[in-house]
Amino acid sequence: MLAPQYRLRSTALFGQTIRNGRKKGSRTVVVHVLAGGSRAEELPLPLQEGATAGPRMGLVVSKAVGNAVTRHNTSRKLRHAFRAVMEEDSLDFPVGTTVVIRALPKSATASFEELVGDVRSCIRRALPR
């Protein structure tokens, strides 16, 4: 499970990430990444007291993916895939980065390994160099 401090819950931040972030897609997911600045005033929205500066992630899993059970299972797989990618040493997320992962219908039938690979690839391409 993804720790609460890494979850994106603000509607405003979801919208800001989707509108202003970099978008990369694959067969199973579309990933929007809005990199925060290195200083607090450059962050998309201020960090709440006690929040981590690590990446925060939100999911969009529409009815096109499947019924409620399928959407929930897909959400769980994507949350775990993001956590696996986040824990890798090869990716360096800038302070205050927000990520929105939108599941495509093929994500419902994809294996966990495929989802991890697609999420990793999309985030790597979307992060600033």
UniProtKB/Swiss-Prot annotation:
Span of the signal peptide: none
Gene: rnpA
UniProt cross-references to SUPFAM superfamilies, sorted A to Z: Ribosomal protein S5 domain 2-like
Class of enzymatic activity (EC top level): hydrolase
Name of the protein in question: Ribonuclease P protein component
GO BP annotations listed: tRNA 5'-leader removal
Gene Ontology molecular-function annotations: 3'-tRNA processing endoribonuclease activity; ribonuclease P activity; tRNA binding
Keyword RNA-binding found: yes
Substrates-to-products reaction catalysed: Endonucleolytic cleavage of RNA, removing 5'-extranucleotides from tRNA precursor
Protein function: RNaseP catalyzes the removal of the 5'-leader sequence from pre-tRNA to produce the mature 5'-terminus. It can also cleave other RNA substrates such as 4.5S RNA. The protein component plays an auxiliary but essential role in vivo by binding to the 5'-leader sequence and broadening the substrate specificity of the ribozyme.
Keyword terms: Endonuclease, Hydrolase, Nuclease, RNA-binding, tRNA processing
InterPro entries (UniProt xref): Ribosomal_Su5_D2-typ_SF, Ribsml_uS5_D2-typ_fold_subgr, RNase_P
Subunit structure, interactors included: Consists of a catalytic RNA component (M1 or rnpB) and a protein subunit.
Family label: Belongs to the RnpA family.
Keyword flag Membrane: no
Source species taxonomy: Bacteria, Bacillati, Actinomycetota, Actinomycetes, Mycobacteriales
Organism: Corynebacterium jeikeium (strain K411)
GO cellular component entries: ribonuclease P complex
Superkingdom of the source species: Bacteria
Known EC number: 3.1.26.5
Pfam families cross-referenced by the UniProt entry: Ribonuclease_P (PF00825)
